[in-house]
């Protein structure tokens, strides 16, 4: 390896290779992506996502970025919440941009039905195809750990947010108790790849996804990275005793 390295599961690879490797994983799992999250979280991810949407509280007229938005699971929540608020008190339509590096994920999302507020775009979280200070909110769910250069993606999030804009990142994290960590490790490394092989015929992709969670920074370290990227009011909320965490901040 002659250039900068990046993590790909438990492997260290050339940073230039990681985007293609990650793209391959999501090419294979795109049609079963929501099933994948059900397996990774035992179905609890749906409650976590509802909590994120409630925290975001989308409003009429807002521009919301759903980065690494995949199949649009979160974007649809945001669009419908903003629409309900609009029905109550009027205002302009919200705009929700789903931006994902993987075209297969975008295609899977589009196939799930039309929502007038949602726009679909293939794009890189490290180089978003958007102008400065264009968004009221930036959300990334279960995606930041797959980015090659996480600090670059955080700086890019700061760039596209308006002053005071909201940053929300939902990601798998570290359980806060040792017994839960041991139980989660057992489930992750023994059960999830086996289910992935039986249900999707793809052990390798699910093994990568489990490993990528373990290589991701813990709650405090990732909160520090968000602050270093130029956000204020940085904090996090643990979900299910730290199996996942919602990280938040405000653009300065």
UniProtKB/Swiss-Prot annotation:
One of the Pfam families matching this protein, by short name: Ubie_methyltran
Keyword RNA-binding among record annotations: no
Protein family: Belongs to the class I-like SAM-binding methyltransferase superfamily. MenG/UbiE family.
Annotated positions binding S-adenosyl-L-methionine: 71, 100, 124-125, 141
Protein name as catalogued: Ubiquinone/menaquinone biosynthesis C-methyltransferase UbiE
Top EC category: transferase
GO molecular function: 2-methoxy-6-polyprenyl-1,4-benzoquinol methyltransferase activity; demethylmenaquinone methyltransferase activity
Gene: ubiE
UniProt KW DNA repair keyword: no
EC numbers, comma separated: 2.1.1.163, 2.1.1.201
Gene Ontology terms: biological process: aerobic respiration; menaquinone biosynthetic process; methylation
Pathway recorded for this protein: Quinol/quinone metabolism; menaquinone biosynthesis; menaquinol from 1,4-dihydroxy-2-naphthoate: step 2/2; Cofactor biosynthesis; ubiquinone biosynthesis
Signal sequence bounds: none
Catalytic activity: a 2-demethylmenaquinol + S-adenosyl-L-methionine = a menaquinol + S-adenosyl-L-homocysteine + H(+); a 2-methoxy-6-(all-trans-polyprenyl)benzene-1,4-diol + S-adenosyl-L-methionine = a 5-methoxy-2-methyl-3-(all-trans-polyprenyl)benzene-1,4-diol + S-adenosyl-L-homocysteine + H(+)
Keywords tagged on the record: Menaquinone biosynthesis, Methyltransferase, S-adenosyl-L-methionine, Transferase, Ubiquinone biosynthesis
Function: Methyltransferase required for the conversion of demethylmenaquinol (DMKH2) to menaquinol (MKH2) and the conversion of 2-polyprenyl-6-methoxy-1,4-benzoquinol (DDMQH2) to 2-polyprenyl-3-methyl-6-methoxy-1,4-benzoquinol (DMQH2).
